[in-house]
Amino acid sequence: MFHLLGAQQNQKLKRRRFFCPVCGGELAVKLGLQKAPHFAHKQNKSCAIDIEPESAYHLEGKRQLYVWLKTQRASPILEPYIRTINQRPDVMARIKEHMLAVEYQCATIAPDVFQKRTEGFKQEGIIPQWIMGYSRLKRTASSFYQLSTFHWQFINASPYRELICYCPERRSFLRLSHIIPFYTNHSYSSVQTIPIHRAGAGDLFFTEPKPSIQYSGWTKAIHRFRHKPHRFNSKETNRLRLLFYEKRQTPFSFLPTEVFVPVRKGAVFKSPVFVWQGFLYLFMTDLGGKRAPIRFSAVLQQCKLHIHNKNIALRSECSEECLSEAVKQYIDFLCKKGFLRETQKEVYVLNQPAGGIHSMQDLIERDRSCFIE
C-alpha cells in the first residue's frame, strides 16, 4: 500500500498509476498548494470508504503517531482496511498483546458515526483508542476546559473516563483525567503533558491515572460564579434559583458552599454541579429542619424524581449504580466536612445549621476552608 504522508511536489508521482485498495478504482494524485497531498477517485464510482483530503495538521499528527508506535515496537500499520466491518483506522498497532485501532480525530464527527466506528472495532476484538487533535481543545482557566458533546464522546468511550489529545506542533500528548463538570460545558480536569519522545504506549493507553484534584482551581471557579451576573440561566437553573429564594431567602450568588462539591462521579450529570447538588441540598435540609432522619435511599429517590421532572439532566444514559455512586460520593463529602453525621448505615442527621451567612466575604472564606488541600 502506498501513502502520501510527507509527499512533496513531485511530478513523478503523477505519472504513476495508483488504485484504491477497497474498490479497485483508479486514483488521481493531488499535490496542490492549498490542501495536503491526497488521493481522489478519478471517476465518480461508489466506494465503500470515501478517500477524503485531510488537513496538514491531521496528516502530520498521524505521521508522528505512526513513527512513535514504531519506536514502541507496536508493529503499526497505517490505514489498514478491515473488510468485515468496512472500516479503516488511522493506525493499527499491537500493544501489551492487545490490538488497538488508533483513531486521530481532528474534525467534528457525528455521534452515530462515532458510535458505529467504536462498536465496529469492538466487534472484531480490537480496542478503539481515540485521540483528539489538540487544536479542538479550549482551555478556559487554570485546570478548566470547555468540553462539548463532541468531547464527551471521547471521554465516555475511554475505560478511564479521560481525554487524550495530541499536538503535532508541540509533539506532545495532553491527558485530561478525573474530569468533573462545573457548568454543562465547563469542566475541571487533572492535566498531564507528555512529550511524545517520553511517552510509553502501555502506560498512556493501559494505566489509570492517579486521582488528583487541585482544590485551589475549583475554589476560584466558585468565586467567579459568585461575582458574575446570572442573566442567562437555563430553565433548571432558574427553578433552583427561585426555590432557594422562596425557601431560604438566599440570592443565587450566595448559594451555600455545600452545593459546589467536586464529585468524581459527577460527570454523569449534564446539569451544573450547583443545580443537581442544590436540589438534593434543599431536600436534605428540609428533613434536617424537621429533625427527621436523612436516608440515602430517599435522597437517591429524590434525585431520580428531579431527573424525571427535568429539573436535573443526565449527560447520557447511565446505570442506577453510576447514579447511586455519584449521590453517595456527595453525601460522603458532606459527612467528611461535618455537615451531615451518619447515625447508622446510610442514615444521617443534619449536623449544623444550613444558613447564617450573609456576608460575601464570609462565604468566600467558608469556600476556602471547605476545599482546603
UniProtKB/Swiss-Prot annotation:
GO terms for biological process: establishment of competence for transformation. Required for optimal transformation. Pfam families: CoiA_C, CoiA_N, CoiA_nuc. Keywords: Competence, Cytoplasm. This is Competence protein CoiA. It comes from the Bacteria. It is found in: Cytoplasm. The keyword Plastid does not apply. The keyword Cytoplasm applies. One of its GO terms (cellular component) is cytoplasm. Its main location: cytoplasm. InterPro entries: CoiA_nuc (IPR010330), Competence-induced_CoiA (IPR021176).
